[in-house]
Amino acid sequence: MDMSKMGGIAPQGKMPVCAVCGFNGAHWLGDHLDSHGGLKNYLAAFGSNAETMSHEFWSLASKGSAPAPRRPVKSSSPPPVNFCGVQFDINAGVPASACLPMPEHYRVPTKGALASDVEDIMISLKMGRSIWVSGYPGTGKDALFSAWSAKTRTPGLLFQVVQGADLQSWRFSRAFDSNGTRWEEGLLLKALRDGYKREDGTTVPYIIVLSDIDRATRSQLEELRSILDSIQGRVPGPDGQMFPVLKGTVIVATANTTGGGDDRGMCTSSQTVDSSIMDRFERAYKLSYMDPADELEILREKYPDFASDWPTVFPTMLKVIGNMRLAVAKNELFFEPSHRIVSAWAGAAADLAVVKGTKGMTDGDILRRSARVMVDKAPNQDVRSAIILHMDPIVPGGTISNSGSNNITKR
């Protein structure tokens, strides 16, 4: 052991005192000085004779029997997170503020077709594939990637396609200063090229979500084509230069359709997407509706008091919704019985219980009165009548009176 490189010796019987913070609780300061930049920097700052060891430590060290200085212990990485059956590492050091927000009351699907859909998407995400995810409104497309970003601490950005918006500004835009005009890099360009920089200086690649991509107009689709070139590992800059995309960056797109436009008349803002753009995505998936068992747990979590007081109302709602979804699949009902609709119906029932009380009411009374928040969203009278007809055999007491008129809003 080279004693000349270990610093000076404190007076016999005394502990060395740290010149930085005054610490004197050890015979040897070498381990303590790791928090102040290390022994070498300490001696450079306070002189080669600065006290770093006690007389007792020096005596043992000179005889070769002093304990070896401890190496700093590296902090352990957080355990991986399981997202629908697929394990993902957590990006330590990435704050929640840099990730997409965790949706309120979000539950990772565990049952039914949607759980299978999400597991396949997670496999593709694990492999860093570019993904197109479609599904009816309210099936949780954006929420899925927001939850994944939040749970894995993956930095994320969501860009929503709005008709008429300037998508080029996501990459760059003109800015003005005293010297005239200049190009100003946009948030998307910097995210694709630079990633997210942690406090320790290391970078973590982003997940980029392009939401409602099938709403893009023809001119917007041309800009999206340039953005999607980044899937090939490069992104165009303002002067035509090509920047490399940070390895590990993932681009996903969400849409109501599979790129062929709306063929049901329910999402009329959806446009036809050029096949050359669709081909840029390595994987494409269509989300199913959530399984009623998973939906029931979400409703119970959102409205625990009502669920406790009226334990059969929510299950009855979900039976109605399931019946409607079967009709949609057969093209017998032109409506979107999504989870948003279920939540609105359940919320209206819970609101009724809080504000007006439900004394003297039955399950059927509550279901009928609160159902108008769903029925009144129907686009026309034919659809409203069809919804009421699908409810009638399931709701206790029915929804159609003996005279044939509906009693959905009966007080």
Feature locations, PLM:
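Helix N-terminus capping/helix-initiation residues
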Residues: G38, N49, S54, D274, ...
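Short functional micro-motifs and their immediate structural scaffolds
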Residues: N24-H27, G259
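C-terminal regulatory/interaction module of P-loop NTP-utilizing enzymes
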Residues: P69-R411
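Short coil/loop linkers at secondary-structure junctions
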Residues: N24, L39-K40, N49, P155, ...
